[in-house]
């Protein structure tokens, strides 16, 4: 019993450190403007017919708020309304189609009933940094019921999971060619409009934000990609957290 408890605590600590590791990586990209879409898929109820909700933002500007019930598009600056509306309109159909696909996918995914209660709750985060003329690459982070975590990188069409249990589900999703294609071409469909809006945002200063707490990072931060250009700041963060991982493993022995 005691050994099992120590092992569980050890795994929990390693998971948190891995999440911080990914934040150290992405923190090095803070100077780049990016598009972020947050998708939520859940089971509808008679009292709440909402089964999906999507929000897409460029930095702090909400450009699309979409659900199976209604749609709104907003811009924080009247001067950006036209461009924000164009991006939002372009993303509307891909977002709607993808959420429908994800709903079907998660409903057919077998999960440990001890970890989930009823219909699995899916959270997806897509991050697309300004491409600057390069091949557009996006990161897709998947969180099923705060228990299964994996990430897809369109840059090299690779997947990474947080643990073996997540890997089982991840491999099945990877075998779904239609899903993979939707993830791959989500950005290219609207790339020109998105890049133009990101370029416009680049000319304006960004507001700084504090580093998120460990609880905020749990369900939204990706694992670091297998290969990617990273700034010096990102490398320093990764190095420090890697040392922490070594200490964690040493204490667990």
Curated annotation (Swiss-Prot):
Expression (tissue specificity): Expressed predominantly in embryonic brain.
Xref: Pfam families: MHC_I_2
Induction of the gene: By retinoic acid.
UniProt cross-references to InterPro entries, sorted A to Z: MHC_class-I_related, MHC_I-like_Ag-recog_sf, MHC_I/II-like_Ag-recog, RAE-1
Region feature Disordered, mapped onto this chain: 198-230
Biological process annotations from GO: cellular response to exogenous dsRNA; cellular response to lipopolysaccharide; defense response to bacterium
A GO MF label: natural killer cell lectin-like receptor binding
Designated name of the protein: Retinoic acid early-inducible protein 1-gamma
Species the sequence originates in: Mus musculus
């Amino acid at each position: 019993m005691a050994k099992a408890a120590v092992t569980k605590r050890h795994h929990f600590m390693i998971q948190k450190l891995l999440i911080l590791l990914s934040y150290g990586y992405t923190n090095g990209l803070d100077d780049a403007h990016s598009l972020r879409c947050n998708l939520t898929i859940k089971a509808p109820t008679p009292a709440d017919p909402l089964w999906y909700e999507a929000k897409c933002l460029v930095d702090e500007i909400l450009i699309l708020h979409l659900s199976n019930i209604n749609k709104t598009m907003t811009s924080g600056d009247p001067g950006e309304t036209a461009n924000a509306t164009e991006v939002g309109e372009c993303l509307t159909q891909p977002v709607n189609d993808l959420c429908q696909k994800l709903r079907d996918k998660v409903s057919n995914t077998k999960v440990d009933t001890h970890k989930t209660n009823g219909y699995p709750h899916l959270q997806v985060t897509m991050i697309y940094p300004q491409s600057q003329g390069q091949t557009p690459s996006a990161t897709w982070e998947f969180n099923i019921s705060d228990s299964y975590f994996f990430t897809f990188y369109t840059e090299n069409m690779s997947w990474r999971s947080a643990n073996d249990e997540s890997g089982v589900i991840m491999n099945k999703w990877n075998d779904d060619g239609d899903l993979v294609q939707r993830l791959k071409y989500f950005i290219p469909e609207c790339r020109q409009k998105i890049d133009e809006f990101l370029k416009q945002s680049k000319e304006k200063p960004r507001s700084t934000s504090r580093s998120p707490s460990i609880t905020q990072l749990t369900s939204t931060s990706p694992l670091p990609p297998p290969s990617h250009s990273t700034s010096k700041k990102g490398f320093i963060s990764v190095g420090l957290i890697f040392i922490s991982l070594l200490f964690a493993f040493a204490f667990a022995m």
